[in-house]
């Protein structure tokens, strides 16, 4: 995040607004207006920042970067995973007739990511000689370290990786009809 902010400052004037305890930096990257924020750890922080970006800054897309744990033996440390969709691996109300990961009142369990954003990110990764994978991102407010839990997330959700914010951003963007990419 600091590198993005430094790059913005070299290219344009940057203003900073603090909302809900988070610093939102407005500026330009390569001529494109952007807002950069570090949401912090967890689903609530992520959803909060996504909603502020959408309502206070009129974001027309939301892109999240961060660290995830691989659930696929073909994804290595340093590789990039571009979301095809995102799912909350903690949400479980199957006893009420919902799919694993599905939030009551929402018709889908997995929130589709923007194919346009994914293709743009894939092209950028290739130019930077990064190994990029496409797959489902599973999120939950828990650090997943036990092999049994990793296998459950991979088997039940078909996830490529897991982390702690993406599905909250995805759900917020889905409900607000804003394209996103994790």
Question: Where are each of the predicted segments found?
Answer:
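N-terminal short beta-loop-beta anion/metal-coordinating cradle
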Residues: 1-51
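Short glycine-/acidic-enriched loop or helix-start segments at secondary-structure transitions
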Residues: 3-5, 47, 72-74, 91-92, ...
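A glycine- and small-aliphatic-rich helix-loop capping segment at beta-alpha/alpha-beta transitions
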Residues: 7-14, 55, 76-87
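Alpha-helix C-terminal capping segments
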Residues: 52-57, 74-75, 171-179
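Proline-aspartate-enriched helix->loop->beta-strand connector
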Residues: 58-63
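Mid-sequence, gly/pro-rich, charge-dense loop/helix-turn segments that line enzyme active sites
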Residues: 71-157
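A C-terminal functional module that forms or caps the active site or interfaces directly
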Residues: 143-182
